């Protein structure tokens, strides 16, 4: 296991020990990370990864911790949060954003530079790294439609660039998950647009999101993938599960596809409620819901 002395001389690196991950997740649940690291440069991340490999320390990389549930026992070993790797650069019709850059901020950069095609992501509460990892999408758009390449690091510390076709994108899926890669940055190809029209479209999508989603409570976003031929929220509603509560977590009364932390809930509450919803929807409709949210850590 990596020691504090192994990390002291790495520049541009903030380290916290036994840090509750509930301080960083959108659900406000999650036990402690043994070691929580915030690299501010790619060089710091590379050196940190090398130290972890040399000491056989397990590594978990998180983006913005939005579509994620960390279990109450926390995560052993080293947890890396990429939020400080957040630079965004524009060159012509191309935007290159580091993994920790927030989607919302990247869409604002696109609008300011009269670039269209990224509006769909304006309300997704995640980072570029997490969005690429799961091919995030909303309102008919998804990352795979605009990504042209992705710079990644593997478990050995090797850095490479994957083309869009090499990403093997699917619905809420990419090769990043399959091969346990770390997203360093991504390039997006957009088109010239009118900044006023782009802003109007972003305002429209944000209004839809705010009117339909329970943004007033902590949540992990959309809990389930969309089943073929159905909408998860509608199936949950038809099973009369809106308002169903376990501990401090309930199926949102505003949007059945969300589970919200209304009263100091924990990850166990989330997992039990997810299991209950899957069971009841299956009984009611015959459809088996599949979680979209990523669940990690120890119980």
Swiss-Prot record:
Q: Which InterPro entries match?
A: FAD-bd_PCMH, FAD-bd_PCMH-like_sf, FAD-bd_PCMH_sub1, FAD-bd_PCMH_sub2, MurB, MurB_C, MurB_C_sf, Oxid_FAD_bind_N
Keywords of this protein's UniProt record, alphabetized? Cell cycle, Cell division, Cell shape, Cell wall biogenesis/degradation, Cytoplasm, FAD, Flavoprotein, NADP, Oxidoreductase, Peptidoglycan synthesis
| Active site location | 172, 222 (proton donor), 292
* Superkingdom of the source species: Bacteria
Know the name of this protein? UDP-N-acetylenolpyruvoylglucosamine reductase
EC number of the protein = 1.3.1.98
What gene is this protein a product of? Answer: murB
Cofactor(s) in the UniProt record: FAD
Q: Where in the cell is it found?
A: Cytoplasm
Question: What range(s) does the FAD-binding PCMH-type domain occupy?
Answer: 28-193
Gene Ontology MF terms in the entry: FAD binding; UDP-N-acetylmuramate dehydrogenase activity
Any GO BP: regulation of cell shape
What is its pathway?
Answer: Cell wall biogenesis; peptidoglycan biosynthesis
Its GO CC terms are: cytosol
Catalysed transformations (reactions)? UDP-N-acetyl-alpha-D-muramate + NADP(+) = UDP-N-acetyl-3-O-(1-carboxyvinyl)-alpha-D-glucosamine + NADPH + H(+)
Q: What class of enzyme is it?
A: oxidoreductase
Please report the organism this UniProt entry assigns to the protein: Lactococcus lactis subsp. cremoris (strain MG1363)
Role noted for this protein: Cell wall formation.
Q: Pfam families given for it?
A: FAD_binding_4, MurB_C
């Amino acid at each position: 296991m990596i020691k504090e002395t192994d990390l002291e001389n790495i520049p541009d690196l903030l380290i916290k020990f036994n840090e509750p991950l509930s301080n960083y997740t959108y659900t406000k649940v999650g036990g402690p990370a043994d070691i929580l690291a915030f690299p501010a440069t790619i060089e710091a991340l590379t050196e940190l990864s090398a130290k972890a490999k040399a000491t056989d320390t397990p590594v978990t990389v998180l983006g913005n911790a939005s579509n994620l549930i960390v279990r109450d026992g926390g995560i052993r070993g080293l947890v890396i949060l990429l939020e400080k790797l957040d630079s965004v650069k524009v060159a012509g019709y191309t935007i290159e954003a580091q993994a920790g850059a927030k989607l919302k901020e990247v869409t604002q950069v696109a609008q300011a530079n009269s670039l269209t095609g990224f509006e769909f992501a304006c309300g997704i509460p995640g980072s570029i790294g997490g969005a690429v990892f799961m091919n995030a999408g909303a309102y008919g758009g998804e990352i795979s439609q605009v990504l042209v390449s992705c710079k990644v690091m593997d478990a050995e510390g090797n850095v490479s660039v994957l083309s869009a076709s090499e990403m093997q994108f699917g619905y809420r899926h990419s090769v990043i998950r399959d091969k346990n890669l770390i997203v360093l940055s991504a390039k997006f190809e957009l088109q010239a647009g009118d900044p006023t029209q782009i802003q109007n479209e972003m305002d429209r999508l944000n209004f839809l999101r705010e009117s339909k989603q329970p943004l007033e409570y902590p949540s992990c976003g959309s809990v389930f993938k969309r089943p073929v031929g159905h909408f998860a929220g509608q199936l949950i509603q038809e099973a009369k599960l809106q308002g169903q509560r376990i501990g401090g977590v309930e199926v949102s009364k505003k949007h059945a596809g969300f589970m919200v932390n209304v009263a100091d809930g924990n990850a166990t509450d989330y997992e039990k409620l997810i299991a209950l919803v899957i069971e009841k929807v299956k009984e009611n409709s015959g459809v088996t819901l599949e979680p979209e949210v990523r669940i990690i850590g120890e119980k």
